[in-house]
């Protein structure tokens, strides 16, 4: 499902916040009528075998295949550069059965007895009084870029998210990952656009190749990101606006607790520094 709202941001008067629940929602949707030609031209114009735009040979068709099957080469690159950086493992947590109105298993005896508020059960982690860092983390990564950014530059923000997801998984924590992109002066009316899509739900199994195929591959954003922006119900400028390297308030407000925000990372050294600084906070 797509959710399109006009919201206010503290630095921009108004912007269109476009949220997609899944990648399939983006694939099945059509851009706003006034933006259809712009989106078709932007994808067709670069459909040639241009690695600097798509990130891999074969154009948008190859990108679609990688998004579906995962990107082993991208995952290996992340592992080689950022894979040695780890937060400490969680050793003091334990799991305890918890009952409530939702969960993983249902007790039919409680259902028949009318105790619906405690009929479901699931196993939850307990701190035990020794943990210094949260067990669940949200990673919000600014993963896009306009035409002046090549695929190698777009790789590194996503690489930070993949490396942190791997490190959090290996240390016994769970995370959700959200990809977003934010521009100002994007429509003819002068409004900005922020697009947002969840790429890994909290508690889901972390598949590094699948994550690399969307977060690190410039072509994923060229296909999905630009298409999402074209769904704004106003005419979008051909430049797709000016990139704003921060997370807007409308996205920040949706995620509470431990949140890692990734913005302005466009090269290998910046990615190393960012991941090292973030993992050092978990000690």
Tell me what each language-model feature is.
Residues 44-136:
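Negatively charged sequence features
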Residues 1-69, 134, 145-151, 155-159, ...:
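Acidic, glycine-rich A-domain
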Residues 142:
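Residues that scaffold, gate, or flank divalent-cation-dependent active/transport sites
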